[in-house]
A protein has these predicted regions:
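Enzymes that bind and transform nitrogen-containing heteroaromatic metabolites
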Residues: 1-194
Length: 194
């Protein structure tokens, strides 16, 4: 089984979106360089960001998101983002009316079921958990192995927190084993202390 990694771009003060679910400049680093990050050529980053991000993306076998993220992205029109093979959606509701049953999206109830399904789908590859409320719940349940943050130099002041609104016991992370500076971003990777 692959590692379970919590990830998002995040403001310096710990937010993944503002109060209106807008990311503001959190993804500007994805268009601030000259090295294409994906086949579309729309994402261009610095060489250091490419060397960190592309291998990570290539290792992801499944991503877990909450129904809220699924809804505000319109389910990415049935195509998982960044070339990911499968998306597991944590929800108490069924798939949307008219949703293509062949789309590689899996709707499950509860975080434990979501992690189990994602690990089954990913095999030995990574399971990525989107930061926010679902990510915070998975961390609180002790199911996260690593925390990755792409810290962007902006202060939101309020909004949607990286670790969500979950009131969980304190979790100690190890010292970062990766610290990489890109254009408009600082990439950090923390193993979760067990």
């Amino acid at each position: 089984m692959g590692k379970v990694v919590m990830y998002s771009s995040v403001s310096v003060d710990g937010f993944v979106a503002d109060e209106n679910d807008q990311p503001g400049p959190l993804f500007d680093w994805l268009v601030s360089g000259d090295v294409p990050l994906d086949e579309s050529g729309g994402l261009k980053v610095s060489q250091t960001s490419y060397d960190y991000t592309r291998p990570y993306w290539d290792q992801i076998g499944a991503t877990i998101v909450g129904r809220h993220v699924f809804d505000i992205t319109d389910g990415w029109d049935g195509k998982p983002p960044s070339g990911i093979d499968h998306v597991v959606v944590v929800t108490h509701r069924p798939a949307p009316e008219g949703w293509d049953p062949e789309a590689p999206f899996h709707f499950v109830d509860g975080i434990e079921a979501a992690v189990a399904k994602a690990q089954e789908l990913a095999g030995d590859r990574l399971v990525e958990v989107g930061a926010g409320d679902v990510g915070g719940q998975v961390l609180a349940a002790g199911l996260i192995d690593e925390v990755r943050m792409d810290v962007v130099p902006v202060v939101f002041g309020s909004g949607k927190r990286y670790f969500g609104s979950v009131h969980a016991p304190q979790h100690l992370l190890e010292d970062p084993d990766v610290v990489i500076q890109g254009n408009r971003v600082l990439h950090l990777r923390y193993p979760v202390r067990r």
